[in-house]
Amino acid sequence: MKLVVLCVLCGIALAAPRQKRLTVGTIAVTGGVGGSTGCVVTGNVLYANGFRLRELNPSEQQELVNYEKQVADYKAAVKQALKERQESLKSRMAGKKEKAVTPKEEDLPKAPQKPSFCTEDDTTQFYFDGCMVQGNKVYVGNTFARDLDQNEIQELKEFEKKQTVYQEYVQKQIQAQVSNLFGGADFFSSFFNGGSEKGSSTTTVAPVLPEDAPEQPAGPNFCTRIY
């Protein structure tokens, strides 16, 4: 049973859109999952991952008001969609002949776009040995240390480009290995479709990967840890 649950979770994780780039010990992009991660506004003051950035101007304050309303509407739409799915499931379990309809992606509630004052550049954190960089500022622990100079900013941008290529390669490798191990999407769909298409067979094709695997780039030397 535990294996089945693990397999289903793996399938969901691989199918879900990525909202974070994550490499342990190097880059972590917080996605605003509770607490103080991501962008937080209180008293018209903007924080990113717990660090104070600045006060919102009047235009941004109005943008925040509009965003709050959009979030409330989105939550209500999600709640209604879940209620309809639950009622449909209950009817089918009660023996009523009701065709299962998979909602189209365009019919699903859409999360509102983040305000313009909360960007990926604001919430991206680069973790190096001894320090962390966010918003082109160096922190030691939670203490602000200094600003990056222009050369260091450019160096960080180049590092992020190379690191992104490396991460995408690694993720494709993992997806290919999981697909080969569990038989691809058909393995997971069998749990939810009850194996309705009996006798059918498919071949999982591994994604095409570069012949030469990219190397993980060395991190910039913005701080020195004393061992």
From Swiss-Prot:
Residues 88-109 have a biased composition (Basic and acidic residues). Residues 88-116 are annotated as: Disordered. GO terms for molecular function: aspartic-type endopeptidase inhibitor activity. Residues 1-15 form the signal peptide. CDD domains: API3. SUPFAM superfamilies: Pepsin inhibitor-3 (SSF55149). InterPro entries: Pepsin-I3, Pepsin-I3_sf, Protease_Inhibitor_I33. Disulfide bonds join 131-223. Keywords: Aspartic protease inhibitor, Disulfide bond, Protease inhibitor, Secreted, Signal. PANTHER family: PROTEIN CBG07421-RELATED, PROTEIN CBG13105. Belongs to the protease inhibitor I33 family. This is Aspartyl protease inhibitor.
